[in-house]
């Protein structure tokens, strides 16, 4: 299988490179793509050094079977046709196509069958907070239909990418020296702070991040679930956490819920 990673130098791209190697993904050939800033960089993969190519509108994706794209919504929209025109399956990590009717939004533990219907050769990856929530919700949905969800998220600096993590680190260093921290990636200073403001506010006074959880959850689960989210940025480098309140049509006992969660792949029940 010929595999490509677009955005290979970003935080997600570098992590994906590690995961493909750790899980022995069947990639006979791997191509890395990036912007002018990252083109020419070299990364190790299975004992080889692979250089980053400049992403351009050409035929570099000819023969590629799967392209993992994590370079932002603008790049995904601009290069989708270039990536897929020779038959490559584009798995997109951005918000560019998530709500398009002809693009499946897939979490493998929840709706893998949706991936089989991808007429544009694009599969969208949901927002990070949506993914971890729907895996848990799906276990409960199998017991009783979920009516509504209230969720509070606590999201690390990694959600803002490598630049976000770097800014948090710089802020801690500046404050330790009595200096003024630089604030660019976040709405406010993140170090020693909590920011209930991720992305821009929409007309209904929820942030765009919060509305992603509403719309994406309903699409993934093919459900009319009502979702109210409060998304908070917290001053840690990695790991998101969520506190979720769920109302179901029939009462579910704690024992039923524990058994349901225990049966879900890639989850660890602590109860």
Mark where each language-model region is.
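Rossmann-fold NAD(P)-binding glycine/threonine-rich loop
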Residues: 81-89, 93-119
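Beta-loop-alpha module in the N-terminal Rossmann-like domain of NAD(P)-dependent dehydrogenases
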Residues: 71-80
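Conserved small/polar residues in nucleotide/adenosyl-binding loops
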Residues: 267-271
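Short glycine-/small-residue-rich Rossmann-like dinucleotide-binding loops
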Residues: 71-72, 95, 127
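N-terminal Rossmann-like NAD(P) cofactor-binding module of classical short-chain dehydrogenase/reductase
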Residues: 66-68
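Conserved N-terminal Rossmann-fold NAD(P) cofactor-binding segment
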Residues: 22-63
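Active-site-lining helix/loop region of Rossmann-like oxidoreductase modules
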Residues: 6, 11-15, 26-28, 38, ...
């Amino acid at each position: 299988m010929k595999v490509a990673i677009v955005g290979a130098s970003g935080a997600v791209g570098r992590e994906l490179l590690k995961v493909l190697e750790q899980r022995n993904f069947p990639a006979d050939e791997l191509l890395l793509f990036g912007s002018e800033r990252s083109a020419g960089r070299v990364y190790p993969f299975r004992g080889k050094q692979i250089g980053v190519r400049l992403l351009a509108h050409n035929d570099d994706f000819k023969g590629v079977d799967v392209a993992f794209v994590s370079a932002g919504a603008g790049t995904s929209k601009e290069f989708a046709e270039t990536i897929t025109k020779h038959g490559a399956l584009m798995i997109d990590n951005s918000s560019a196509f998530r709500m398009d009717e002809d693009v499946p939004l897939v979490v493998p533990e929840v709706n893998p069958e949706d991936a089989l219907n991808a007429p544009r050769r694009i599969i969208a990856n949901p927002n990070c907070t949506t993914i971890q929530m729907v895996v848990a919700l799906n276990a409960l949905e199998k017991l009783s239909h979920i009516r509504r969800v209230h969720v509070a998220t606590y999201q690390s600096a990694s959600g803002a990418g490598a630049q976000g993590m770097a800014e948090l680190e710089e802020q801690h260093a500046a404050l330790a020296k009595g200096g003024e921290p630089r604030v660019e990636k976040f709405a406010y200073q993140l170090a020693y702070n909590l920011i209930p403001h991720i992305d821009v506010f929409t007309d209904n006074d929820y942030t765009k991040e919060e509305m992603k959880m509403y719309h994406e959850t309903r699409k993934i689960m093919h459900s009319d679930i009502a979702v109210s989210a409060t998304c908070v940025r917290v001053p840690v480098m990695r790991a998101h956490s969520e506190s979720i309140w769920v109302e179901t049509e029939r009462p579910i006992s704690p024992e039923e819920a524990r058994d349901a969660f225990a049966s879900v792949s890639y989850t660890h029940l602590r109860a």
